[in-house]
């Protein structure tokens, strides 16, 4: 499949086509795995099954990649997660975008891999070359907000030093998928929430902030539950 981006290189921008043949979403990617296990137990208390091991990796249908500003979902219990996204052309050429692993939390309690397929993988239409941010990678900041009933709720925030670096993430994916990672999209997994639990709102917004180069990638989309037919979903 082909995705279209604007590649921002220093102060220049140019159109870029990115061909990809597979997409994966990582999870539980904290560099401190003791803290990750605490988070796993919190999720278990909410009814979400514990993974057999961490970090985790899930295959995702390529067609779910989306830059849409509006998504339709089934039911009211879906929410986004801010993540960095690696676009791997080959081992020498990798780009970074910003994404949201939007997930059906009702289905997640039953079947996590299938929960990853039912909602889109949102992504920015702008990307950066990885080599332009690699040296100061840990200083980059992920943030997200949920807009619920007209109120903006600060939802997530954390420096990228908290989760696996691109090199660590690619090494992890290589340990699960044999062969080169050419034409692969990797969603990184996310940072912690500032709220006590999931917030199900009408809009999700996120930023990847580069304080050194004074720039950011920004993502925002509206969430519309299907309402024209009642099928008994929560």
Give the location of each predicted region.
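Catalytic-core "active-site belt" of small-molecule-metabolizing enzymes
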Residues: 1-179, 185, 192-234
């Amino acid at each position: 499949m082909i995705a279209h981006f604007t590649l921002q290189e220093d102060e220049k921008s140019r159109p870029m086509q990115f061909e990809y043949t597979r997409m994966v979403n990582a999870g539980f990617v904290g560099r401190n795995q003791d803290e990750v296990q605490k988070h796993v137990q919190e999720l278990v208390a909410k009814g979400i099954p514990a993974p057999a091991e961490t970090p985790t990796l899930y295959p995702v249908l390529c067609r779910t990649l989306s830059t849409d500003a509006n998504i339709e979902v089934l039911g009211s219990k879906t929410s986004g997660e801010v993540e960095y996204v690696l676009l791997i052309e080959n081992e020498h050429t990798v780009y970074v975008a910003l994404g949201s692993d939007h997930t059906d939390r009702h289905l997640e309690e039953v079947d996590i891999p299938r929960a990853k397929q039912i909602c889109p993988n949102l992504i920015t239409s702008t990307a950066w070359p990885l080599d332009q941010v690699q040296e100061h990678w840990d200083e980059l900041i992920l943030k997200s907000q949920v807009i619920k009933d007209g109120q903006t709720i600060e939802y997530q925030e954390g420096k990228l030093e908290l989760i696996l670096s691109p090199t660590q993430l690619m090494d992890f994916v290589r340990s699960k998928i044999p062969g080169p990672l050419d034409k692969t999209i990797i969603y990184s997994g996310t940072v912690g929430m500032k709220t006590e639990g999931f917030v199900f709102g009408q809009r999700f917004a996120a930023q990847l902030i580069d304080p050194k180069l004074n720039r950011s990638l920004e993502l925002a989309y509206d969430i519309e539950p299907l309402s024209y037919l009642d099928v008994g979903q929560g």
